[in-house]
């Protein structure tokens, strides 16, 4: 399964937005600059988050994005589905029906074994993403990123937050 690069961008941006003080916003420009991303493409990912009600937006000189609810109430699956959509990662086209050896009128009563395995794997993947909260990511990053870099990053962010 290959996810759009915007999924990675959205996850990282949400982790940064989780650190904003109440009532502050961060612009697309600042988020793009922080992550070295093209602003126009990042904007599309952020709009997807907004349409999914994961972030709030405001216009104007101090406008931008902030989380719409606490990071403990947003999971990875919420973010992935906001960018990628909610469709299953595997679509069965039932090619077994094309088998020339199949008797006329033969009908299978259950999905094929391939589809069942793929759907089970998809559900396991979604359950894993569902269990990981944005607040978990922030906690992991705060432990793994050197303290000086973590602090300087948020100082940089706060200077640009509206």
Regions from the PLM with identified roles:
Residues 92-162:
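C-terminal regulatory/oligomerization modules of transcriptional regulators
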Residues 40:
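Key DNA-contact positions within bacterial/archaeal DNA-binding proteins
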Residues 28, 46:
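Helix-turn-helix DNA-binding elements, focusing on the entry/boundary residues of the two helices
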Residues 1-14:
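Short alpha-helical segments that sit at the start of domains
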Residues 29-36:
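A short alpha-helical element within helix-turn-helix/winged-helix DNA-binding domains
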Residues 53-62, 66-68:
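Beta-hairpin "wing" of winged helix-turn-helix
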């Amino acid at each position: 399964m290959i996810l759009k690069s915007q999924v990675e961008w959205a996850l990282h941006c949400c982790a940064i937005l989780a650190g904003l003080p109440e009532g502050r916003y961060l612009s697309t420009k600042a988020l793009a600059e922080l992550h070295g991303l093209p602003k126009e493409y990042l904007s599309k990912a952020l709009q997807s988050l907004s349409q999914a009600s994961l972030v709030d937006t405001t216009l104007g000189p101090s406008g931008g994005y902030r989380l719409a609810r606490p990071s403990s109430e947003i999971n990875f699956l919420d973010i992935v589905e906001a960018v990628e959509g909610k469709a299953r990662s595997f679509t069965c086209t039932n090619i077994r029906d094309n088998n020339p050896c199949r008797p006329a009128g033969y009908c299978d009563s259950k999905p094929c074994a391939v589809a069942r395995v793929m759907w089970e794997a998809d559900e396991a993947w979604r359950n894993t993403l569902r269990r990981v909260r944005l607040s978990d990511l922030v906690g992991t990053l705060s432990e793994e990123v050197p303290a000086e870099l973590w602090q300087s990053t948020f100082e940089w962010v706060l200077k640009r937050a509206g």
